[in-house]
Swiss-Prot record:
Glycans are attached at N56. This is Casparian strip membrane protein 2. It comes from Panicum virgatum. Belongs to the Casparian strip membrane proteins (CASP) family. It is found in: Cell membrane.
Amino acid sequence: MTKDVVVEHGESSKAPLVAAPAASGVGRAASVADVFLRFLAIVGTIASAISMGTTNETLPFFTQFIQFEAKYSDLPSFTFFVAANAVVCTYLVLSIPLSIVHIVRPRARYSRLVLVFFDAAMLTLLTAGASAAAAIVYLAHKGNVRANWFAICQQFDSFCERISGSLIGSFAAMVLLIMLIFLSAFALARRH
């Protein structure tokens, strides 16, 4: 009777190989949840980028010859917001195949570490973009009397509704990225 021996990578043995135990259902469920959360975050970031990127409003002033226009591209914070959401959305789309690999191979450790690292980097970028835009949205709604910055939302109501609404998808994507990081950390911790 021969004794079964597990052979690790780089070792040789004449003993028969023993297959690693099948992945548990919990690891596979976590990987499926990972893919689902990535799709939701893609929807949030692309909706925010499109909503902010297509925002503009023109108001006539006494005559048709003089008009005031509010566009997202007039403010660098909004431009950064659109760029940050576009970069994060692109990353999320590109990370889907790697996330799908985790459904097939739930024990893949290094690829999960890569995802945790880049998820954290994208969370940082998205937080910076959303925070910059949120500060300007607040000024658009409330103004700053001490700096003589007047609120513009009484005049540009459609513009303000769009820029405020675009923040929702971005903040939702931030929460989803936090959940993705915790999910990956949980999957990595289960192996030790």
